[in-house]
UniProtKB/Swiss-Prot annotation:
InterPro entries: Ankyrin_rpt (IPR002110), Ankyrin_rpt-contain_sf (IPR036770), Multifunctional_ANK_Repeat (IPR051165). Coiled coil: none annotated. The keyword Lipid metabolism does not apply. Keywords: ANK repeat, Repeat. The keyword Membrane does not apply. This is Putative ankyrin repeat protein RF_0266. It comes from the Bacteria. Pfam families: Ank_2 (PF12796). ANK repeats lie at residues 68-98, 103-129, 130-161, 163-189, 203-232.
């Protein structure tokens, strides 16, 4: 019966022999000299059972799931970012390629995900290293590194269409540009077909569709300014689709490349989206949504009639310049919070936004501050400002048109 061993982090592993337990402890505690001593106690040459030894985590609350999470010694060394111990294990022939754990990740994959460049270099120097699995983690990882991705590609990792999509969905322009350049021959020949793409659509149009879906505005701008600009009909199609699904950042980025009739079609789609999305609040709440302007001029892409009771504020540079810098950041952050957390109660988010603003005003003495409705008055219609003023008074009676009460 294997012995149970609990680490300092609370993880429980099964250990077969005392020497295996000691080796495991030395590796997990980053003690290379002790690891060397315990490895030396095995019979040489090391058997495959020793080289590929795995330590299985136990979930005591779910005993039937024993063995679903497991780690090789090499993976443990990578988890610790322990280059010295990993090098020792490699020199003794311990496995560096086996997938470990429920995430099906290799030591190289984990190192690529974490951005451990020196460990990636060491592993890539090994003749028998398998690199394909690691490319996925390098692209989507916590610390994306072009250097690591290039090491893997130079070692033989094949860039596939799904890697392009992964770079788009994880919003990293530099990684996308690297992969785009590497796959340019396929893109030019329309051989790069993303998952679910139609054979009738070119590679560049497929990429724009993915960027539009994930609202990756940097990639969209890159494509529109490149020598491989997508067809106009697809630019229009993706604009309307984005409006239909409430993807404002995509709409803003594509707006300069569409005709007025397409914009109006998008407006209709977007109004219907808001009615469906905010049905419970449509008649009773004002919803603030950021339009993320990317130009020096206010973006008036979508406007609503007064009956809709929906207020769409454009957080463009001119608007921000008319507000105090700190105040505008509070507003902008709150707007993004609402935009990204639409499953939450809109009323509660509005309360939080005004509370944040009031707390800011209370501790600020270096400028003349007035209620938000007053600051916005020069920029919007009287009817719109009236609605905003009413909301301020409803939520916080201490907010008056002349300023905050003491």
């Amino acid at each position: 019966m294997p012995k149970k061993f609990t680490t300092r982090k609370g993880d429980i592993y099964t250990i077969d022999t005392p020497n295996e337990e000691n080796l495991f402890k030395s590796v997990i505690n980053k003690n290379t000299s002790e690891a060397f001593r315990y490895i030396s106690q095995f019979n040489f040459p090391l058997s495959d059972n020793i080289k590929t030894i795995r330590y299985f985590a136990i979930d005591e609350d779910k005993p039937n799931n024993v063995g679903t999470s497991h780690s090789t010694l090499s993976l443990i060394a990578v988890i610790n970012n322990d280059l010295e111990t990993l090098n020792l294990l490699i020199n003794f022939g311990f496995d560096i390629n086996n997938h470990s754990g429920i995430n099906y990740i290799t030591p190289l994959g984990l190192a690529a995900d974490k951005g451990y460049k020196e460990i990636v270099k060491l592993l890539c120097e090994q003749d028998d290293i398998k690199v394909q699995n690691a490319l996925y983690y390098a692209i989507r990882g916590e610390n994306k590194s072009i250097e690591i991705i290039d090491l893997l590609v130079q070692k033989g990792a094949i860039i596939k269409p799904e890697h392009i999509e992964l770079a788009i969905s994880h919003s990293n322009l530099s990684v996308f540009e690297y992969l785009f350049e590497k796959k340019l021959p396929d893109i030019e020949k329309n051989n790069l077909k993303l998952i679910g793409s139609s054979p009738a659509i070119s590679s560049i149009d497929c990429i724009l569709g993915e960027a539009s879906k994930y609202q990756n505005t940097e990639v969209i701008k890159f494509l529109l300014s490149s020598g491989y600009k997508p067809e106009q009909k697809y630019i229009d199609e993706f604009f309307v689709s984005a409006a239909d699904n409430g993807r404002l950042k995509t709409c803003i980025t594509l707006k300069a490349n569409i005709e007025e009739h397409t914009r109006l079609e998008g407006l209709s789609k977007y109004q219907n989206y808001l009615k469906d999305k905010y049905h419970d609040y449509y008649k009773t709440h004002i919803i603030f949504l950021s339009k993320f302007s990317y130009t020096d001029e206010p973006v008036e892409m979508f406007m609503f009639d007064n009956e809709s009771n929906l207020l769409l504020l454009s957080m463009s540079r001119p608007l921000r310049s008319k507000l105090s810098s700190k105040d505008s950041y509070i507003i902008h952050d709150a707007i993004k919070e609402i935009f990204n957390n639409t499953h939450l109660n809109i009323k509660e988010l509005e309360l939080a936004r005004f509370k944040a603003r009031i707390e800011f005003i209370k501790i600020t003495t270096d400028e003349d501050l007035v209620p938000l409705s007053n600051k916005l008055a020069p920029l919007f219609s009287p009817e719109l400002i009236h609605d905003l003023s009413k909301l301020e008074e409803e939520l916080f009676p201490e907010v008056k048109l002349a300023g905050l009460a003491d």
